């Protein structure tokens, strides 16, 4: 995981990852300045090393001289061994209110050169001649990661076509959406997707996936929207993938900060939505897909502060994308975490957390890896003896009766501060809370309680589920029947007891496995601090 350092007043923004020759290449925005696109590499998708930045804002007067926004890197279908980066740029001329798309190319993924543009610098027509001469002399004479050469025949920077999309600052929100490019090639034709907005309808319901077709190398023609759900303000960071012949459109929704998807049999047909179309729970945003030698991966940043997504952002481990027999997409645990598994913890060593309870029935039986737990009244937790920081817990959990159950982890046995994971196996609801104690004498504020994330699932087998809980550094992941339901980062608690809690309930745990994980080799701020 990595984040920007607090002292730098920077945070990670949208990400894009490409796997090539055994290396994962991570490109990401840097917030709030948006003045360059950073680049890092990894062999395991978990530990990263920063390399030279890939791209920079243009010099004053260029179309991208204010900010750089989301990018997408893919192989150039017209030139073997070359890579293309489509990216979003904002200009000072428009005060950052108009988004356009540009292109840069590279032969090695490390050294990038901006492609020619038709944009001209019209500043200062009344400037004194010495000032005009100084401006001419200061301009670069060749393309690089900052400067693009002029070509009147270039189609870049791309702008929204007013025939299909909002394209004027006089329309809609007075703020033109045309960002987050994604290049998709179906084997015959190439298409460029972008977050755009149709021209009609309620203003905050115009968000669509804009579409352009590559008619010749580096030249694109506008098409009608690939998908307009008639519901959202924007569909950010769109992606299209082909899985077993079906197409899936993945986008991030600003309204609830979730990653959703739609599906269709072939491009051009209407897009449909499943009853459950959320890939990752709230807080996971700007989802990007990439393919490695094992299949599709879903990447995103997690925002620990939903009220300000320009700060406290972390990149969590990727999720493997799989397709169910019924066609739904599911995010599952990235198998690379297995390399960090260490000692097995004896799950027969378990005890009740609260000793000073009144007369009631409490049962804790351990038999060959199975556990029978009962609490007749009130709250009780049964925790494993060993203190744990990083771990993976797996079990089949079965509830009996109508009581409540859940899990606790990184729990202080004295104050009982830690993480509380509420589980409703009948309705399919998981809710993670951080519950702690404030400063002495802080009155009503001494109780510290935060709802961190909620996730939902459907299962035919009510009251029973295969569960997996991973705590790896500040990363927390919870899966039900192999599907990731919760995925987040939180830094409140770092070690303590792990166990199962009951409220007037009886549960059975079978196939219980608990293993320590090696501590992450890198801190959350490793990449941004060097």
Which functions belong to the PLM regions below?
Residues 14-15, 199-200, 237-238, 286-287, ...:
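Generic recognition of flexible, low-complexity loop/linker segments
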Residues 21-23, 293-295, 366-369, 427:
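Short, solvent-exposed coil/turn segments at beta-strand boundaries
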Residues 85, 298-300, 428-430:
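A short hydrophobic beta-strand element
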Residues 235, 284, 390:
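Short, well-structured alpha-helical interface segments that form or flank functional binding sites
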Residues 286-299:
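Hydrophobic membrane-spanning alpha-helices of multi-pass integral membrane proteins
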Residues 312-530:
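Extracellular glycan-recognition regions
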């Amino acid at each position: 995981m990595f984040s920007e350092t607090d002292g730098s007043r920077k945070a990670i923004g949208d990400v894009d990852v490409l796997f090539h020759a055994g290396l994962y290449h991570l490109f990401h925005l840097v917030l709030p300045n948006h003045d360059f696109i950073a680049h890092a590499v990894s062999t395991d998708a978990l530990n990263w090393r920063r390399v030279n930045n890939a791209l920079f804002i243009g010099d004053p007067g260029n179309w991208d001289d204010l900010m750089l926004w989301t990018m997408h890197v893919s192989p150039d279908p017209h030139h073997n061994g070359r890579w293309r980066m489509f990216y979003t740029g904002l200009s000072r001329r428009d005060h950052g209110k108009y988004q356009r798309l540009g292109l840069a190319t590279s032969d090695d993924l490390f050294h990038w050169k901006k492609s020619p543009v038709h944009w001209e610098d019209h500043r200062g027509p009344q400037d004194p001649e010495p000032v005009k001469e100084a401006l001419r002399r200061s301009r670069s004479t060749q393309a690089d990661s900052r400067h693009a050469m002029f070509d009147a025949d270039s189609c870049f920077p791309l702008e929204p076509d007013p025939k299909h999309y909002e394209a004027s600052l006089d329309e809609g929100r007075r703020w033109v959406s045309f960002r987050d490019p994604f290049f998709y090639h179906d084997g015959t034709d190439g298409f460029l997707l972008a977050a755009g907005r149709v021209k009609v309808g309620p203003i905050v319901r115009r968000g669509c996936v804009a579409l352009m077709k590559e008619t010749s190398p580096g030249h694109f023609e506008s098409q009608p929207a690939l998908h307009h759900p008639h519901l959202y303000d924007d569909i950010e960071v769109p992606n299209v993938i082909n899985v077993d012949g079906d197409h899936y459109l993945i986008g991030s929704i600003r309204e609830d900060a979730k990653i959703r998807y739609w599906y269709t049999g072939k491009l051009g047909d209407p897009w449909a939505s499943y009853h459950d179309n959320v890939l990752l729970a709230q807080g996971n945003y700007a989802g990007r897909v990439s393919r490695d030698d094992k299949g599709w991966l879903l990447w995103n940043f997690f925002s620990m502060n939903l009220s300000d997504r320009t700060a406290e952002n972390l990149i969590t481990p990727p999720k493997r994308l799989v397709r169910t027999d019924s066609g739904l997409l599911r995010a599952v645990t990235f198998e690379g975490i297995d390399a960090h598994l260490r000692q097995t913890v004896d799950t027969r060593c378990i005890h009740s957390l609260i000793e000073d309870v009144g007369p009631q029935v409490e049962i804790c039986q351990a038999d060959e890896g199975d556990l029978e737990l009962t609490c007749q009244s009130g709250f009780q937790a049964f925790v494993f003896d060993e203190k744990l920081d990083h771990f993976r817990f797996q079990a089949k959990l079965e509830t009996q009766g109508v009581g409540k159950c859940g899990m606790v982890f990184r729990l202080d046995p004295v104050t009982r501060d830690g993480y509380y994971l509420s589980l409703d196996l009948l309705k399919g609801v998981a809710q993670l809370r951080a519950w702690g104690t404030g400063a002495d004498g802080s009155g009503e504020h001494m109780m510290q309680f935060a709802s961190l994330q909620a996730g939902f699932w459907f299962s035919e087998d009510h009251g029973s589920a295969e569960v997996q809980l991973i705590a790896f550094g500040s990363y927390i992941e919870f899966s039900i029947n192999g599907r990731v339901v919760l995925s987040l980062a939180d830094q409140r608690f770092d070690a303590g007891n792990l166990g199962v809690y009951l409220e007037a309930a009886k549960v059975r745990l079978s196939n219980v496995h608990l293993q320590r994980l090696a501590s992450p080799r890198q801190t959350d701020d490793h990449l941004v601090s060097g």
